[in-house]
Amino acid sequence: MILDTDYITEDGKPVIRVFKKENGEFKIEYDRNFEPYFYALLKDDSAIEEVKKITAKRHGTVVKVKRAEKVKKKFLGRPIEVWKLYFTHPQDVPAIRDKIREHPAVIDIYEYDIPFAKRYLIDKGLIPMEGDEKLKMLAFDIETLYHEGEEFAEGPILMISYADEEGARVITWKKVDLPYVDVVSTEKEMIKRFLRVVKEKDPDVLITYNGDNFDFAYLKRRSEKLGVKFILGRDGSEPKIQRMGDRFAVEVKGRIHFDLYPVIRRTINLPTYTLEAVYEAIFGKPKEKVYAEEIATAWETGEGLERVARYSMEDAKVTFELGKEFFPMEAQLSRLIGQSLWDVSRSSTGNLVEWFLLRKAYERNELAPNKPDERELARRRQSYAGGYVKEPERGLWNNIVYLDFRSLYPSIIITHNVSPDTLNREGCKEYDVAPQVGHKFCKDFPGFIPSLLGDLLEERQKIKRKMRATIDPVEKKLLDYRQRAIKILANSILPDEWLPLLVNGRLKLVRIGDFVDNTMKKGQPLENDGTEVLEVSGIEAISFNRKTKIAEIKPVKALIRHRYRGKVYDIKLSSGRNIKVTEGHSLFAFRDGELVEVTGGEIKPGDFIAVPRRVNLPERHERINLIEILLGLPPEETSDIVLTIPVKGRKNFFKGMLRTLRWIFEEEQRPRTARRYLEHLQKLGYVKLMKRAYEIVNKEALRNYRKLYEVLAERVKYNGNKREYLVHFNDLRNEIKFMPDEELEEWKVGTLNGFRMEPFIEVGEDFAKLLGYYVSEGYARKQRNQKNGWSYSVKIYNNDQRVLDDMEKLASKFFGRVRRGKNYVEISRKMAYVLFESLCGTLAENKRVPEVIFTSPESVRWAFFEGYFIGDGDLHPSKRVRLSTKSEELVNGLVVLLNSLGISAIKIRFDSGVYRVLVNEELPFLGNRKRKNAYYSHVIPKEILEETFGKQFQKNMSPAKLNEKVEKGELDAGKARRIAWLLEGDIVLDRVEKVTVEDYEGYVYDLSVEENENFLAGFGMLYAHNSYYGYYGYAKARWYCRECAESVTAWGRSYIETTIREIEEKFGFKVLYADSVAGNTEVIIRRNGKVEFVPIEKLFQRVDYRIGEKEYCALEGVEALTLDNRGRLVWRKVPYIMRHKTNKKIYRVWFTNSWYLDVTEDHSLIGYLNTSKVKSEKPLKERLVEVKPRELGEKVKSLITLNRAIARSIKANPIAVRLWELIGLLVGDGNWGGHSKWAKYYVGLSCGLDKAEIEEKVLRPLKEAGIISNYYGKSKKGDVSILSKWLAGFMVKYFKDENGNKRIPSFMFNLPREYIEAFLRGLFSADGTVSLRRGIPEIRLTSVNRELSNEVRKLLWLVGVSNSMFTETTPNKYLGNESGTRSIHVRIKNKHRFAKRIGFLLDRKATKLSDNLREHTNKKMAYRYDFDLVYPKKIEEINYDRYVYDIEVEGTHRFFANGILVHNTDGFFATIPGADAETVKKKAMEFLKYINAKLPGLLELEYEGFYVRGFFVTKKKYAVIDEEGKITTRGLEIVRRDWSEIAKETQARVLEAILKHGDVEEAVRIVKEVTEKLSKYEVPPEKLVIHEQITRDLKDYKATGPHVAVAKRLAARGIKIRPGTVISYIVLKGSGRIGDRAIPFDEFDPAKHKYDAEYYIENQVLPAVERILRAFGYRKEDLRYQKTKQVGLGAWLKVKGKK
């Protein structure tokens, strides 16, 4: 490994020294043959002899060209011949170069300013820091005696501290009694001791913090004064101090002096860079500061020296820790740039790029351009035409479509080959000519800059052209993946990055390279030109919705792999998150209120990157199958594993079953006991019994089951001692997969002579907590015993006896008897070893979060985390939770787990081989309080707050605090809405701390993720996206080209102009309202985790704000059930509900005579196109179309209703199932309540002919379980009285309303699926019917109770059974007379799911249902998804004069209204006059296709939004209002916190008048009215109060604003004023300074005070509106109240587009 290079002089000649570490030893290699040189371009080669005669003097020595040779090079891509001039010594070059340049025959000289040692590295292709050598590091720090006014190094050094891997020590020359302090006699002896320490320890790296400018210089000066030779170099030299700009830099020969200060200044943005501040920012831990005066006092008095020594020791220790943190990144940068770490760590970003390009130029035989002289620099900095700005016509505009180019300028650089070496190049066959400026760029070869940035992206466009030309769909797909992969070559991530994926529903943490490589081995990837693409299914990634910022699970469509050679960027965030990406791969950064894609090449320290606040993982009750785990082990590992089952009830079972199976397959005669086995097979679902026969339901499954019993019958053995059957696992290894779970549950599994356990473990809170204990402080061991066999042990450690008690209890619960030691619990069971090893790993370095934990219910995940924390966590003194582990996989697993629990406030650190995860949030099982003001990614950074609100903030702020301030009016709500996604979404921001660049050659990888095209990846989890960003130089760079920059901008203008011209000529948009649904429409929501069916009007609880005639109510914690584009039912956030009165037509859409939906004429429903309109292979989203009520029957014939279970699923308690079946029977055919004594204790049930069956299946099990006391037959045959006091009370309380009618309580909507199904089973068994109508199976529930029927429908939807409802038109009759009721039928649509999940208790109904469905199959394609279809029967206009409502559903913009999927608009649609909404959308998409087909290369236009109305001052100063009524302003002064209420209110009214009402004159009238009222003192003083905050100590204010003046007067009265105090004041009329006239508002007395009307008009109201109205030609004086009438500007202000 090369550490550094330099040169020395021997006999007047340079000798290159290469300092290396090789095989653990330091060595110096010498090269005496390398010569200094530069290049000269001559007018005539004959002049070379004259040039060789040129001389100059250097320190009395004559300097001249030693020799010259002619060489062929390229200059800006053009062939050129230059002379390479060699010299004797490197110092000859600066001495003679100007004289050579001035010779008339010399055109110019080149590469004369590259230092000799750096030139050597470039020319020889040597890369510093390359290799795997382990470097020894030593950090040191000094403490000095300083009194104010003393000269530098006048005072002595008091202490020298140093730290390395062995620890930290302090050397001093006063007695300090501490174990890490070495005391010597004098300062001189102390310095000598330190020099001896360095010599003995012989570190490769010396780490300092500002050692360049303090420590080394101070030591050197004191050493000189004391007569000590300050030898630190490995060559026996003293440190070399040299000037570097306005700072110094210190070299120690043979060692790398790594000064952290310039590195940290370049990497991290901090308000102060003290060692203490940096340490806390990096590691999240405070460090004590001892000030110079305190050190001096302690030294001179002898008191407190221990504190100083401890501080000195900690300085060295902290410097060492920081060095270890930053050194690897600087080493990677050194490898990439190809220069020494000493140089790289002290270089600016611009210099690093220069050195990188210089090396690349040498590799390509390119002559590097010279740096610009002052004249050239001035030329480069001259202005040129900027980007396109269309000066808008004054006035107000309607219907604004916003179109934008993605990455416009980088795309132009690559598309048009813009580069200095292609500029105006003669002799090319093809040029791209920049419009307007006329610069030509050769297209015959790739330019130097574009080729470094985007060679592969050019290839992508060729493939797109091939795609358009080919008609072969396979080739087209392959080419499509190829062009994606080519894009990804510059936009991919490296193989070692972590990636969480859901594979077949189970979350796995994988390295992306390993996962893609292994998956591709099993599949058949498509390959073209080295790009491999494998289409996959069953794999999902964690991503986020770009619009809503909500985390989503999205399918991975393909895995992509390609070889790559180029730059990679190592991006480290302040939380410790980290990812390596290729140059063009994007992360998501905060820019101007939004998240945008920013590439690795563009990301800089201080950027804020998107990381997850929460990830929404699927939840289910997990169950571990031990058999599956055992099957994953080799046979030798399971040779002693057996399965056992009790004999009771199974005598001769295995042989009897085998004989029966052979008989079924007609190989033997019918056994006498066949009925017994047939009944068992029927329970397993293999056969169906009839009165005199049976029917095979699944022949293939039965055949496999027989294979199992062939082995079982032969291999099973009888163990008489334990009265059990036993079979060796290995005997069943190949067939056990055929054993049904119902049978497997009855077996136990374990070792032959040891412990056995049930084969399934339910992952509940107890087991999860035990796993957490193990992962934190447990290990699993397998070792040889004395009998040469194997012993297995699992030990979990803890020193807290209460914790050990809990561990023992939990371990005993699952594994029987355990052993308790002093500080551990031991489970000596092989099955425990197998289980823990497979789920969690064994050693500290390979531990992991078990996969089953991630997808378990939230309470289970918390239980695991609690166990882990108790075992391996601690509560840091700063109140933060700290978790420690050596396992990188476990760290990432913990982060994903914490994110799934909604915790994002984490930091990850790595120290001494241990990862530490710090959590700064309150946890439910702890009483910790989060630490305030610490920067964690869950808070909103103050930089974001400042950008959003346009004012300074002292600290970061939590979303809750921000909301509180907005609600109080302290922060502007309109501005806050810009970052609403940051407050409410699943994204938080993490600051980029460091970006390191290096070279990489090998495979890079990417995923294609459906819809979102982003995924979670990297160490600590970041959101990554594939995109591209181009790089261009800066004005001082060698390769900068003013003509190139000018051309890129000109092309940008041209493309924007063309686009605008095209859209003006071909398209024109108008706006129409798109309204909502009626107030009594029921929507399905989940509020705070609970499912509700609520009338939409009930969601509207208050008016939070108004936009025009529309009223809005903000919602929190509310989600709506919706359907995504993949046909899945999902829950999505509802941020608000809107209502308004309408005069539009309201239509009632009837689906049956009892099921309808009321919508406005413009509201869209979601229709489903059948395969006659859209081919079946088309994506589902192309078949889901928006349709207006009057278009039903023409455009589409079917609408969508829900058809998938949304209730949670559990492992149900069998007795609880029976109880809910009974309750269902009671609601159907029961009676309860009343005032009799019987009613207090009994409920009645009419069973009819099914009494015996109901008793056997329901009543008897409930009696035996003690749920009911008893049951008795009544006088009427078939009736039963059930004795149960609690049940009688329960039924009265919950299942009858105040009128005594049966009902279903709302809590049932949140029961587990299994219990709802049990209730429905009982209900349908009582009141349901099964029939065949015209050959079609029919299942109905009949009632006369409409409310009950509606509630039953909701329960059916909850368990995934689609249904409808209709009412009989003929009234019911009783004894020949009309009863006044009509039968209401709930009709089952998805009959097969009903049969499978609900069915009937009664055999007669169950059999009839089975028979009816046997020949009836589900043919609906919709059943592949989570929905069913319904067909409107009738549409009619109705009278309706109340509010109509709409809800905003994030992501999908759809919700279920009365069970029908409808589209929620944001209030408005864009349209073309005379065309419907579908036409508008179609035309908009057609325009994008049209223009993008015309645009060359990578250029692509995107549809960014539609605005209802807006006005423009310049390109970057405008205000618009979108369809949601959201007002966006840019570049215009908007309300500030220090404005009074009158200013805020006036501005809001002005914007509303202009943007919502389209009336500028109204806006002007509003301002005049306010100024008039102010002038006449008619404005209430409450609206004039100004609130400003004191942000620092009063003594620190240099300027005294009104609030400071008031504060100082209050302080003078003894009122305490501290930073954070808000001063509320009002300005009074009078003369003098405003501060003198400002008084606290509570002292304002209207009887004796008058406010300063002129102040409020000029400094509050007019500034709030002036910039807005200036866009319409108004001046300040036009807006004030005037007694004489002013001529209006109405004609001029007429809204464009209005007739």
From Swiss-Prot:
Gene3D superfamilies: DNA polymerase family B, C-terminal domain, DNA Polymerase, chain B, domain 1, Hedgehog/Intein (Hint) domain, Helix hairpin bin, Homing endonucleases, Intein homing endonuclease, domain III, Intein homing endonuclease, domain IV, Palm domain of DNA polymerase. Keywords: Autocatalytic cleavage, DNA replication, DNA-binding, DNA-directed DNA polymerase, Endonuclease, Exonuclease, Hydrolase, Intron homing, Multifunctional enzyme, Nuclease, Nucleotidyltransferase, Protein splicing, Repeat, Transferase. Residues 770-903, 1222-1361 form the DOD-type homing endonuclease domain. It comes from the Archaea. This protein undergoes a protein self splicing that involves a post-translational excision of the intervening region (intein) followed by peptide ligation. The keyword Transferase applies. GO terms for molecular function: DNA binding; DNA-directed DNA polymerase activity; endonuclease activity; exonuclease activity; nucleotide binding. CDD domains: DNA_polB_Kod1_like_exo, Hint. SUPFAM superfamilies: DNA/RNA polymerases, Hedgehog/intein (Hint) domain, Homing endonucleases, Ribonuclease H-like. InterPro entries: DNA-dir_DNA_pol_B, DNA-dir_DNA_pol_B_exonuc, DNA-dir_DNA_pol_B_multi_dom, DNA/RNA_pol_sf, DNA_pol_B_thumb, DNA_pol_palm_dom_sf, DNA_pol_type-B, Hint_dom_C. Pfam families: DNA_pol_B (PF00136), DNA_pol_B_exo1 (PF03104), Intein_splicing (PF14890), LAGLIDADG_3 (PF14528), PI-TkoII_IV (PF18714). It catalyses: DNA(n) + a 2'-deoxyribonucleoside 5'-triphosphate = DNA(n+1) + diphosphate. Its EC number is 2.7.7.7, 3.1.-.-. Belongs to the DNA polymerase type-B family. In addition to polymerase activity, this DNA polymerase exhibits 3' to 5' exonuclease activity. PI-TspGE8I and PI-TspGE8II are endonucleases. This is DNA polymerase. The lineage of its organism: Archaea, Methanobacteriati, Methanobacteriota, Thermococci, Thermococcales.
